[in-house]
């Protein structure tokens, strides 16, 4: 049985990825005689989960054996226009009853990207009273914020992911300022 270099195989896959339908099985590659000695499914997830867990690939990337577990792709889709319908009535009710609300997004959040959050906030059509501006911690931009007439504040946290744990200090200061009624 002929063995293939993981680096060479990856290079071929990158070059040929536009010639295959997503989710199809590749049985032959140019430059190699006969069928491939393994099943190769095209598509980012189909290839990546096998390639990233291959011991030869890990060795070539100098990943120490046992230092990390099995590589698993956690999110195959990034939805820039997610509509969080269930949140809209909740926030409208807060506004009608005069409650303040804080909505925040990490600007590196790939679970619910900040563009999706901004889209559903815009759909509320609330007047803006403090337009888009940076909020600062120790003379550094920590994110951007906007305040609406209905006592709703929207903020982003720079270089943060989906939850506060990605930027705990910035998240704490943002919440501390908001809960005490200070501008971000």
From Swiss-Prot:
Main location: secreted
One Pfam match: Peptidase_S10
CC terms in the record's Gene Ontology section: extracellular region
UniProt subcellular location: Secreted
Gene Ontology biological-process entries: cellular response to UV-B; flavonol biosynthetic process; proteolysis
GO molecular function: serine-type carboxypeptidase activity
Keyword line: Glycoprotein, Secreted, Signal
Assigned protein family: Belongs to the peptidase S10 family.
Protein name: Putative serine carboxypeptidase-like 52
Signal peptide as annotated in the record: 1-22
InterPro entries: AB_hydrolase_fold (IPR029058), Peptidase_S10 (IPR001563)
